[in-house]
Amino acid sequence: MLLVIDIGNTNTVFGIFEDQKLVRDWRIRTKRNTTEDELNVLLTGLFTGSSVALADISRAVIASVVPPVERIYSAFCKKYLRCTPQWVSPANCAGITIRYANPQEVGADRIVNAVGAHAKYQTDLIVVDFGTATTFDLVSADGAYEGGVIAPGIGISADALFSHASKLPRVDLMTVPETVVGKDTAGSIKSGIIFGYAGLVDGIVSRMITERGRPHKVIATGGLAPLIAGVSATIEAVEPNLTLEGLRIIGSSAE
């Protein structure tokens, strides 16, 4: 079986593939001060009750945007999985051409999303990923990563508002407001964040398409993708497992 790991600034996602089937997946908070032994305890616990054991894992593919933990994950794979992990990089991206001025600047998560999206759709694409940052990545029909846009993420933007405005309460961002015009402070904040980000998405996507001069299919991934997609005029599909699928494809291409 293949273990895929997406190490993000906020969350780390683990997925287990048997051939092309995603068997299980888990999302945890990213810890920068963990050890390979703690990772073993954590994953052993996650696997308990599932049909998978650590001994079933023969390979690992990892995408990371958190350099301080990479040595720890490498040590875990070597010590407990008896394998050397495959790390996603511009030189290891399943045939995707990177047309960035400096390919080394492209985050592994963005590369993986491009791989997964191109494999599924084979057309001009814009991939919107709602993570710690909200990223917009343009992938051409011929499988090239053309570049993109990086904006502050929904979570960190909301945190900045709450931390700098003492009288504003924290609000639940997991549901869409019934109306744009809020009737109380909490409703007004929620409306501003959710509809504001939908407007940001639609505005940036529209500008990207205008600049390119032709239609692009727009897909979204990340934790809040279903929420924003529901009020966006441009997002056409939500792919919750896009990053894991991209990691699987990169792993398969190296066999």
Curated annotation (Swiss-Prot):
It catalyses: (R)-pantothenate + ATP = (R)-4'-phosphopantothenate + ADP + H(+). K(+) binds at D129. Pathway: Cofactor biosynthesis; coenzyme A biosynthesis; CoA from (R)-pantothenate: step 1/5. The keyword Ribonucleoprotein does not apply. One of its GO terms (molecular function) is ATP binding. GO terms for biological process: coenzyme A biosynthetic process. Keywords: ATP-binding, Coenzyme A biosynthesis, Cytoplasm, Kinase, Metal-binding, Nucleotide-binding, Potassium, Transferase. The active site is at D109. The keyword ATP-binding applies. It is found in: Cytoplasm. Pfam families: Pan_kinase. Substrate binds at Y100, G107, A108, D109, R110, T185. Its cofactor is NH4(+); K(+). PANTHER family: TYPE III PANTOTHENATE KINASE. Catalyzes the phosphorylation of pantothenate (Pan), the first step in CoA biosynthesis. This is Type III pantothenate kinase. The gene is coaX.
